[in-house]
């Protein structure tokens, strides 16, 4: 590719009739589209991987580099083209970037020898040998390839590289977010696995795709498009041959739902089938010991086993040949580069917020379920025991006795919770014990209200309060009317009428069960009047009466003593 005012070559792949599903014929140079760029307005940079989703390790959050993404997707010649996004995801240090660089060779090539020369170093997405992660966040290649499909339509092809999952610095949420984002925005997701498809690989796929499906506002049939299982270092060609045919037979067995399978295993497989429109599998051999053990390996084909190169020549065209390209769709509609930019912005906001639940490790999820079950068991014990004390068919019990029973049962239930074997450790379990105590107190408050409702005096508080208000207003109205204070008498009559209307309404609500909110409001107003006015007044009157009674008793006692002494003298 030339820079500045030179011509940019973009590869066009023609299609001819092929005898096998994987066979691809390569075009001659007449199919290469040349795009003239104005050197005065655009300075071409060397194509390179561009970081579009940044990973912040300190707070385990992700940020979209909108400027970088916009500079790629909003170029004049591609922004209104339908987009094809091929993403490679999977565990870290399994060769995702290495594979993508061969895809770049295919996209830039103009001949059937796209795989390159034997002594040509592999360049493109950064990769290296070793055990430490290389890629973080999400990267895309800065060069968007415009390809003409067999039907004559042009599409924009984007290659995406993702942060490897399950490294020592990433949480389950980090892994789920990266995988979900790449799956939601890609039309083909290559799930890069090593040696085999393990059950935990399927479980992680279920978790990650469900995390992506939660973030999508509308689900149109199956939310995602094509999933390609790529099994690297396949060691059993005598059972299933390398390539697509052997891979699909192997995958069919792995994803088969059997009657004798455990329900959990069946659900995993059903979920995966429900998420993707197309699912395939490709078996790729090991690239050779020189690749695995040479610290200076730079991708030269001479050091790669011939069997690997043979299958690689089948795999890459299978994904990227013009007749095999899968255009990105969301909710049944084709997505352009311009649309993809907006979807990226919308999706990253969802994952930056707190609307979605946080994915958890298997240990944490199991520990939570274990502790929640212990909480539920202890709370059930408390509720059943309290039902025996003050349930619906039990008579009213004194509040002091009820509180004493509550405290005894609470202590018993906490002991029951502690006695259950739980995962997570003491600190983890303490949070659930505090949750249990709070829920028991909340349940006790409900039982207390239910018990108060059985108290005939408590049940009669509202009508008694309303009658007291009406009686008081009647007396005050009569007195103020008698002495000529007619305005006050009128106000008292108005209050008395409103109180009478409230009483009739309350009686209707209790009888019919309708307008319960209105009945509750009347009860609350009556309770306020009782607590703030009538109860303090009655307490004062009672205190005065008791004080006067005590005074009279003392006076009578003293009088009797004095009289007795006088008689004695």
Swiss-Prot record:
Its EC number is 3.6.5.-. Residues 362-453 are annotated as: 3HB (three-helix bundle) domain. Residues 1-464, 509-569 are cytoplasmic. It comes from the Eukaryota. Residues 454-462 are annotated as: Linker. Residues 486-487 are lumenal. Residues 1-49 are annotated as: N-terminal hypervariable region (HVR). Residues 80-324 form the GB1/RHD3-type G domain. Residues 535-569 are annotated as: Autoinhibitory domain. It is found in: Endoplasmic reticulum membrane. It is an enzyme of class 3 (hydrolase). GTP binds at residues 93-98, 232-233, 291. One of its GO terms (molecular function) is GTP binding. Mg(2+) binds at residue 97. One of its GO terms (cellular component) is endoplasmic reticulum tubular network membrane. It catalyses: GTP + H2O = GDP + phosphate + H(+). Keywords: Coiled coil, Endoplasmic reticulum, GTP-binding, Hydrolase, Magnesium, Membrane, Metal-binding, Nucleotide-binding, Transmembrane, Transmembrane helix. The keyword Nucleus does not apply. It is a multi-pass membrane protein. The keyword Metal-binding applies. Atlastin-2 (ATL2) is a membrane-anchored GTPase that mediates the GTP-dependent fusion of endoplasmic reticulum (ER) membranes, maintaining the continuous ER network. It facilitates the formation of three-way junctions where ER tubules intersect. Two atlastin-2 on neighboring ER tubules bind GTP and form loose homodimers through the GB1/RHD3-type G domains and 3HB regions. Upon GTP hydrolysis, the 3HB regions tighten, pulling the membranes together to drive their fusion. After fusion, the homodimer disassembles upon release of inorganic phosphate (Pi). The GB1/RHD3-type G domain mediates GTP-binding and hydrolysis as well as homodimerization. The two three-helix bundle (3HB) regions in the homodimer are loosely associated initially, but they tighten upon GTP hydrolysis, facilitating the fusion of membranes. Monomeric and homodimeric. The homodimer, transiently formed by two molecules on opposing membranes, is the active form mediating ER membrane fusion. Belongs to the TRAFAC class dynamin-like GTPase superfamily. GB1/RHD3 GTPase family. GB1 subfamily. This is Atlastin-2.
């Amino acid at each position: 590719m030339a820079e500045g005012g030179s011509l940019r070559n973009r590869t066009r792949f023609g299609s001819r009739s092929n005898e096998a599903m994987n066979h691809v014929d390569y075009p001659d140079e007449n199919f290469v589209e040349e795009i003239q760029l104005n050197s005065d307005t655009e300075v071409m940079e060397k194509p390179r991987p561009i970081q579009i989703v940044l990973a912040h390790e300190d707070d385990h959050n992700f940020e979209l580099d909108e400027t970088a993404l916009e500079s790629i997707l909003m170029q004049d010649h591609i922004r209104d083209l339908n987009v094809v996004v091929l993403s490679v995801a999977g565990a870290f240090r399994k060769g995702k970037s290495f594979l993508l660089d061969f895809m770049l060779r295919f996209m830039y090539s103009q001949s059937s020898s796209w795989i390159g020369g034997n002594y040509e170093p592999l360049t493109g997405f950064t990769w290296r040998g070793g055990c430490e992660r290389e890629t973080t966040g999400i990267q895309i290649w800065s060069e968007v390839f415009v390809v003409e499909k067999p039907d004559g339509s042009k599409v924009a092809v984007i290659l995406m590289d993702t942060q490897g999952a399950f490294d020592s610095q990433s949480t389950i949420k980090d892994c789920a977010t990266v995988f979900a984002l790449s799956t939601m925005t890609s039309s083909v997701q290559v799930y890069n696995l090593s040696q085999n498809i393990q059950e935990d690989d399927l479980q992680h796929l279920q978790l990650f795709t469900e995390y992506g499906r939660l973030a999508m506002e509308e689900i149109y049939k199956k939310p995602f498009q094509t999933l390609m299982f790529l099994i690297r270092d396949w060691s059993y060609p005598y059972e299933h041959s390398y390539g697509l045919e052997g891979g699909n037979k192997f995958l069919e067995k792995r994803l088969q739902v059997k009657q004798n399978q455990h329900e959990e295993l069946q659900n995993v497989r059903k979920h995966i089938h429900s998420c993707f429109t197309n699912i395939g599998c490709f078996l790729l051999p090991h690239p050779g010991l020189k690749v695995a053990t040479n610290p200076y390996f730079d991708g030269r084909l001479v050091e790669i086993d011939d069997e690997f190169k043979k299958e690689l020549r089948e795999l890459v065209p299978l994904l990227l040949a013009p007749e095999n390209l899968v255009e990105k769709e969301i909710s049944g509609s084709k997505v352009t580069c311009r649309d993809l930019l907006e979807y990226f912005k919308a999706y990253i906001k969802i994952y930056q917020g707190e609307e979605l639940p946080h994915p958890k490790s298997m240990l944490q999820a199991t520990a939570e379920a274990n502790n929640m079950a212990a909480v539920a068991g202890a709370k059930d014990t408390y509720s059943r025991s309290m039902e025996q004390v003050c349930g619906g068919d039990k008579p009213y019990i004194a509040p002091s006795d009820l509180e004493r029973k509550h405290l005894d049962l609470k202590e018993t239930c906490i002991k029951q919770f502690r006695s259950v074997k739980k995962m997570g450790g003491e600190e983890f379990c303490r949070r659930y014990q505090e949750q249990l105590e709070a829920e028991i107190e909340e349940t006790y408050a409900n039982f207390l209200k239910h018990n108060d409702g059985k108290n005939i005096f408590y049940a009669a508080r509202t009508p008694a309060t309303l009658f007291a208000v009406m009686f008081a207003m009647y007396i005050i109205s009569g007195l103020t009317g008698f002495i000529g204070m007619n305005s006050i008498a009128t106000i008292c009559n108005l209050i008395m009428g409103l109180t009478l209307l409230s009483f009739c309404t309350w009686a209707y609500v209790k009888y019919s069960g309708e307008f319960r909110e209105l009945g509750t409001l009347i009860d609350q107003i009556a309770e306020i009047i009782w607590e703030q006015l009538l109860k303090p007044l009655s307490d004062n009157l009672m205190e005065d009466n008791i004080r006067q009674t005590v005074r009279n008793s003392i006076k009578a006692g003293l009088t009797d003593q004095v009289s007795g002494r006088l008689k004695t003298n």
